[in-house]
Amino acid sequence: MIPWNPEALELFNRHGENHRGALLALGADPDEVFSDWKALIESRAAAAGEREVEPGRVETELIPLLKSSQACPAPDAPPAVPPSPPRDPSPRAPSTLQKWFGRSTAVMLWILGVFLPLGVLVFELLAGVCAEILFDPIPTWGHALLIALVPAANALALAMGSRERVRAAGTLFRWIGRLNGMAIGIAAFYALQFILVTPFAVMAIIYFGIGFIPLSPLLAFISALAIRSRLRRARFLTEAPPPAAWWRTALPAFLLLFLLAVPRLVVPRYAPQVSDPDPAVRARATAVLRVLGSRDVLLRRCYRTQEPMDFFTLVLGGSFRGGRPASRADAQTAFYRVTGTPYSAVPPPRLKGLRGQDLIDSDWWDPALGGDQVAARIKGLTLSQSRLDGRIDSASGTAYLEWTLEFHNASPAEREARALIELPPGGAVSRVTLWINGEPCEAAFGGRSQTRQAYQQVAVRQRRDPVLVTTAGPDRILMQCFPVPVDGSMKTRIGITVPLLVPDAQKAEAALRLPRFVEQNFSAAPEVQTSVWLESDQPPLEVKGGTNGFLVLNGSPYSIRGKAPADSAASAPFLLLPLASPPPRVLSRDARLGANEAILQTLDLPEDPAGFPDALAIVIDGSARMDAHHAHMTKCLFDFLPPETRVRTWIAYDAPKTVDGKPPFHIRYAGGCDNGPALVQAAEWAAENGNAPILWLHAAQPLDSPELEALRQIADFSRGRLVIHSHQYGPGANRIAEQLADLRLIRPLPVLDDRPMEIINLLQNRSGRWHREKLAGDAIPGDVPEGSSHVARLWAAGEIARLSNPCRKTGRDEAVALARTWQLVTPVSGAVVLETAAQYKAHGLEPADPSTTPGIVPEPGTLGLLLIGAPLLLAARRRRRT
């Protein structure tokens, strides 16, 4: 191609415009004819060795072509018209009708191709109407930029409306053609996405113009095609080549949007398969979602079950082929399996871009209301006050804590506050109080199912003011209260009776780990912290944890004050206290015992404090959340495990991996893995090796495991000899422990600060164990001082555990009656506060007598014990210093 002289180009265009009407009358396309003539003139000028096309060349070549076009009609055309009379060599002015039609077409293209898609884009970013009703067309800012390219490209092309601008555009004209092709591909993709609702969109226009949202891509697509036709005609006014072929611009843009949609399309197809009974199907679906699935779409489906109404999701997602749609439970399971994080531990999803409103703030309800799981956090429900009071009686080896919580609800509906609380090791809830109309009301204690049924009847159905506390696995309770009124508050208190830990019987030390949240459905503002105030008969040796440390004030008793985080992400503070060596024996009397009965408490020392199991099975969770604790865990297992111990390790991946000996130093953690199959295999090996203990190191297990029936069978035939020592890294629920709570199989290690050696010490049987027995008559020693009544409550908790042992065929009813008498929350009992006496009577419950509930004020027996035990404690402290 050679360049054109400006005069030659002007001459060619003038002749072409003068003969356009004649060509149209012959049924030919003038633009195609002019393109062919122009190419012919260029080729002949190049063959003659000319550097550019001159006006003379145009006259020489064009006149014969014009004559031949008039003499040779097009095929199937009417007879040739006589030659037109000579015309004025100046360009023909368009008629009034042509001007009106051209301007009207341009105006419609500006409206439908520029202003409408731009307005719909801004409206959807601000309001999110399509995302709420059909599907989210703008899931990311990248999608917003691609959509904005459509009106921008159309506007640039329409701006090239005059010949002068086309000539001035130069190489820019080529880029305008490419952008137009991309706009065609983008508009075609979204027009196809809305194709299922397009027939109804026309009718929806009358409803506040909402139908323009699904119609906008189709109208923009038609406008872009019309603009491309104008660009092809305009190229005759410049030397720029024609616009690039559609498959070079439109097709790549279409495929790019489709690839961006793939992570969203695989979710509805594979999320239901993550819960499939077939392990192979589960593993394949989990692998696909981890590689291709969208975390954001999964998180949204954890809250919403509405199926997106776009073409590709319905067709490729499986809905048109009879596939089962993903339920909320499927999405929650898939989200954990893919990310390794429970959906409730992640902030609720937000509509992207400028829209700002929370999806959870739409018309959703609380699906876990009245259930036995904490579930997701609810916006507007906050912990407004938190205080922890306590009394430590180191002489009796006990402590009593009262945790007072107040919740505030700023959401537009009544809400239920739920929290999973980790108790101090061996602790038991012995008091529950709820403030009703400003007055504290004590709880009634009864059977587990009895109290839950009363709570659901009064709270969920009658929407009154109860609170329920039940166990949720070993050393954990579930607290739930409903309804927290709109713009109102609800206040409750939980009393906990705790035995002091003796981690190492060779040391004159006891430990107390404070309770903490491990999961909650409410938020705690940064300024809200738990105010801790403890009184102790002895000054603590060490206090760890808290936000700014703890302050110890001398006095009688000693005061320990500080602040602790009120969120489940924080670890629990703990105290080390002096313990007399040897610890004195203690008697405890209570009105609920017989007239001549008492509880004797002693501390049993281990026979072989340095002993270690001959064989040990280790199960390591392969979930992603374990990666942060890998260094600590491997140091514990590699540096401190005795070499003579037989060890076999299971890495709990989706399919468990077995390793003879210690675990590999490098472990690949991914997603959220079901630890049930690995525990079953470890239990089978342990049963073959003399019921060797199992050490289970894991992160949160928020989902039920379908593989535990085999583990139950092994535990039943072990007759209580099989033990799983567990340690959880980080907060979160442990549904596996809750599923197996009735077997007393899983025993959490009383770890204080996650030191590597601490786990080994606990496995070496170094700790002392409190022993409590009921004596009567002459069997009661007369030289043993009387201590706290909490010793008797802890004896009752142990007796309830013995009576409800799964190896016993009878005793459960006796255990429930004992829990009701001693007012304890155990695996067979719960505590519930109702609003009226009629509600208690209707459910066969009786609220606790306030005179029998424990309190912070020291008991008379404790004061007497202080006088006797103080010299022993003082002597122990002096020996420690020396």
Give residue spans per PLM region.
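Internal/C-terminal transmembrane anchor helices
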Residues: P241-R269
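Membrane-embedded alpha-helical segments of integral membrane proteins
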Residues: W175-R233
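VWA/integrin I-like adhesion module and closely mimicked acidic/polar interface patches used
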Residues: H632, H666-C673, P677, A700-N765, ...
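Asparagine-centered strand-capping/turn motif at beta-strand->loop junctions
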Residues: I392, E406-A413, I421-L423
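An acidic, Ser/Thr-enriched
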Residues: R431-G473, Q480-P485, K491, G495-L616, ...
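…and closely analogous acidic/polar surface helices at protein-protein or active-site interfaces
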Residues: P613-I651, I667-N675
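Membrane-anchoring hydrophobic segments
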Residues: P83-M182
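A cross-kingdom C-terminal cell-surface attachment/processing module
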Residues: T862-R879
